[in-house]
From Swiss-Prot:
Coiled-coil intervals, chain numbering: none
Binding site for CoA: G220, I221, G222, G223, T224, I320, G343
PANTHER family found in the cross-reference section: ACETYL-COA HYDROLASE, ACETYL-COA HYDROLASE-RELATED
Any one GO MF annotation of this record: acetate CoA-transferase activity
Protein name: Probable butyrate:acetyl-CoA coenzyme A-transferase
Lineage: Bacteria, Bacillati, Bacillota, Clostridia, Eubacteriales
The protein's annotated pathway: Lipid metabolism; butanoate metabolism
Amino acid sequence: MYQKLLEEYKSKLVTADEAAKQVKSGDWVEYGFGINCARDFDEALAKRKDELEDVKIRCDIGAYQHFTAEVDPDNKHFTWNSWHVAGHDRKFINKNLFYIPMKFHENPMMTRKDCVPTNVAVIQCTAMDKHGYFNFGGSSVNCCAMMETARVTILEVNEKMPRCLGGNQECLHISQVDYIIQSKNEPIATIGSAEPSPVEIAMAQHIIERLYDGNCIQLGIGGTPNAVGSMVAASDLKDLGVHTEMYVDAYLLMAKAGKITGARKSIDKYKQVYSFAMGSQELYDYIDDNPGLASYSVDYTNNPWVVAQIDDFVSINACIEVDLYGQVCAESVGTRHISGTGGQLDFVEGAYKSKNGQSFICLPSTIEIKGEVTSRIKPILTPGAIVTDPRTATHMMVTEFGIATLKGRSTWERAEELIKIAHPDFQDELVKEAQKMNIWRKSNKIG
């Protein structure tokens, strides 16, 4: 059996340059998510720049050098399109890379249903196992959906990719693959853990006071989640669960401290459930072949109705600004694109529907730009800012000054709650603006 698989493997083995010849002018090419993004293939495709026109590339958090974007800054030959802008994507956004709006849990559905069909799909993965399966490693997000719908399927094997157990839709059989590239086995991209600032530590402290034994926690990336992870690790909390889109080093801290058991989870008991991982090499070593973790496609991890089934769910995310109505922007500064909707709205909605669920969106009360300090809590969002979470979805907002609960609150109550956690230097100004907007009563208080 294995000998037959090896023969099939050899018959499909090609160089990156040979694989890149599958791309034709006008094609749509899609790369795997994050650390699964094609690297050797993209480098080979860049060499064909002068042979090709109007090749569109879809990616999601491209973790590696974008060779095709670098050789074609005017996007005459290659145009990048990203489901979420981060990592190397940020170098090209608003130049020759464009954003694809989405709710993250709908990504596989959009791939199967509404996207212009992919002509060539390329995913970086593990080596083939004895059963003929390639594991998607650090990301199961929409890999199966990509491969199901593509005209040509290509795997780029990297022997340094962690093998991440399922779950569901975490691997692909050789029979479903057209070509295989043996990569140069470059190190998997890592991201450092941001050291939390005093403000982020203060926000984390407010959240920690709301946690209790048995909570199931979803964390985003950044200083506040890292601070929460450190505080949980040092606390007496126990039997915590994990159900998240992104598995980050903060979870590793909690796991090493023995805080995570998943014993009280309503579903996927004892399993740490995630869709993709990005972090340190130590994190990748931890998730490698670890039966305590389960990798799923994002239409499971981020489905609000799945999240809602998990009692005592806690979602912790961050944003750029919020207005007095409770509209949250987490993806742009005015019209300048920064990141994307990602899974924030998925978890905001899912966590609230969970029994005893809590959703926290964190932001420092102020920001300093070119020497000028301004409030991140604004009367209205900056013109052009994208609404990530509508006011109807926002549950709780967190700054270093406290927590504002918005669900079930009228417009004047929301204004009062938000101004209470604004920086004191801006509270009077916000009250005046709220009065102009007719969302302030004379009896409102901010003390």
